[in-house]
Amino acid sequence: MEADFEPLEPSLRNIIDQKSLKWIFVGGKGGVGKTTCSCSLAVQLAKDRESVLIISTDPAHNISDAFDQKFTKVPSKVNGFDNLFAMEIDPNVGLNELPDEYFEGENSAMKLSKGVFQEIIGALPGIDEAMSYAEVMKLVKAMNFSTVVFDTAPTGHTLRLLSFPQVVEKGLGKLLRLKMKLAPFISQMGSLFGMQDFNADTLTGKLEEMLTIIRQVNEQFRNPDQTTFVCVCIAEFLSLYETERLVQELTKCGIDTHNIIVNQLLFRREGQAPCAMCSARYKVQGKYLDQIADLYEDFHVVKLPLLDKEVRGAEKVKKFSVNLIEPYSPEKAAAEAVAEEEEEGTSK
C-alpha cells in the first residue's frame, strides 16, 4: 500500500509544463519570502512562455526590490529579459483614481455620470476596491500575456482579491436590476438639467461592459486548467496554521491549489558541524516538515534554503529560481559558491 502513496515531485515543474495556465497566484503569511518565490517562478515561466507578467498587489511592492528595478502601475520590461514584464498596483486605490478614459465622452452628462457612478458604487460594501481590480484585469486581458503571476499581499488581502469577481458581479447585478426602476427618474433628472443624453443607458453601459469581463475572470479563476494558487510558508507553527487556513479558504472558493513552497529551511551538509542554534532550529523545522508531509501528501512540496545573502537583482533571482525546478542540494550549492569565489579571484 505504501507504494501507492509516493510523494509527488518536489518541484514546480508541473506548473511550467501546464501550458493552459493563465493566472498563477503566489501567497501566504507575511515575511515568508512570497516575493522572491513569485519572481523566481515568473523567471522560470519566461523560459517557456511567449510573454509573462508579474503583478504585485502587496502595498509593500517588493518586486521592485527583488529585481532591483523601479516598477509602476504600467507593465514594464524587466531588465535582462525580452518577455518578462512587471507592474505594481495599489489594492487600496478606489474609483477616484480610475482613469478618465473609463468615463469617456465630451458632454457634461458623462462628467456628471462619473460623480453619480462613484456615489452609487461607493454605497456597495467592497465594490470600491474590487472595481479598481476589475479595471486592472481589463487592462491585463487586453494586453494578452501568456501567463500572469500575482505576487499577493498577506493572506487576508489575498482572499479579498480572489473573491472580488463575486463581489463585483453581485453588486453590479443589483444595480442593473434596479435600472428599470431608476430609468424614469434618471431621465427626469437629465431633462431638468437640460442634458437629454443623460439616461439610464449612459449610467449602466460601462457597468454591463465591466460585468462581462468580471464574469469571464470569475469563470477562469475557478477553472483549474487556467488558474492555480501556490502557497508559500516557513516551517513554523503560525505559518503552517495560516497555510492550512488559506488552503481551506481556497478550496471553499473553488480555486485550485496543489503546490506548497516551504522557504528558509536549514540544510545539513555532510562533514560540517552545525552550531547549537542551527541544530535546535533544524530540529524544530524537521517537526513541522513532518506535519506538512502528512497534511499535504497530495501536494507538490518544494523545499527552499535559508541563504546567507539577499536574493536581489535579476541575476540572483535567475540563479535562485533553479531551486523551484531542481531540489536544492547543499553540497552542490557549496561547490558552486567555491567556483564563483575562484572566478572572482581570477577576474581581479
Swiss-Prot record:
Alphabetic keyword roster: ATP-binding, Cytoplasm, Endoplasmic reticulum, Hydrolase, Metal-binding, Nucleotide-binding, Transport, Zinc
Locations listed in the record: Cytoplasm; Endoplasmic reticulum
EC number: 3.6.-.-
GO molecular function annotations of the record: ATP binding; ATP hydrolysis activity; metal ion binding
Binding site for ATP: K29, G30, G31, V32, G33, K34, T35, T36, E236, N263
Active-site residues, record numbering mapped to chain: D58
Source domain of life: Eukaryota
Binding site for Zn(2+): C275, C278
GO cellular component: GET complex
GO BP field: tail-anchored membrane protein insertion into ER membrane
UniProt xrefs under HAMAP family: Asna1_Get3
Role description: ATPase required for the post-translational delivery of tail-anchored (TA) proteins to the endoplasmic reticulum. Recognizes and selectively binds the transmembrane domain of TA proteins in the cytosol. This complex then targets to the endoplasmic reticulum by membrane-bound receptors, where the tail-anchored protein is released for insertion. This process is regulated by ATP binding and hydrolysis. ATP binding drives the homodimer towards the closed dimer state, facilitating recognition of newly synthesized TA membrane proteins. ATP hydrolysis is required for insertion.
Subunit structure comment from the entry: Homodimer.
UniProt-listed PANTHER family: ARSENICAL PUMP-DRIVING ATPASE ARSENITE-TRANSLOCATING ATPASE (PTHR10803), ATPASE GET3 (PTHR10803:SF3)
Homology family: Belongs to the arsA ATPase family.
Protein name: ATPase ASNA1 homolog
Naturally occurring in which organism (per UniProt): Culex quinquefasciatus
Taxonomy of the source species: Eukaryota, Metazoa, Ecdysozoa, Arthropoda, Hexapoda
